[in-house]
Amino acid sequence: MKLNSANSRNLLRERQRRERAAAQPLRVMYPQFASLKLEFVFAESNPEIVAPTPHLLVMHPPTQGYFVFACPCADCDGDFDLTSAVAELARSREPKAHGNLKCGGQRIRDKNGRAPCDLTLRYVIASGPAPAS
C-alpha cells in the first residue's frame, strides 16, 4: 500500500488514539499534579507561511496521561512528544518547564511533493500542586 500524506496521517492518528486510550490517568502517573497547563506557540521556519494559532490545554487528574500531540498542520503527518518534558517537570519539582521541539513530519509543500514540516513548537508546561491531604 502506497502511503500518501493523508494515509500516513490517518495511521498515525489511529495509533495515537489507541495509545491515549491505554494511557493511565494523570492522577496515577503524576499524583503530585492537581493539573497541568500546556501552552503551545508555533513558529514556521519560512516567514511567508502563517503559523498555526497558539493552543492552550489544561489537563486534570482524570485525563489520560498522554503527552503526544499532533502537528496542527493539516497536511503534516508529524507530532510533538512532550512525554519526557512532563516527566522531567515531575522530577524537578519546579512549577514550570519550557522548551522547543521541531516537528519531524512531512508536509505536501507544492506540486513537487513532500518536504520536512519544520514547524517549531515553543511550549510552557505549568503544574498545579496536588491538594493537601
Annotate each PLM feature.
Residues 1-65:
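N-terminal alpha-helical interaction blocks
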Residues 38-39, 97-133:
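Short metal-binding segments enriched for Cys and/or His
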Residues 70-76, 103:
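Short cysteine-rich clusters marking metal-coordination/redox-active sites
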Residues 81-82:
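Structured alpha/beta or helical-core interaction and ligand-binding surfaces enriched in interleaved
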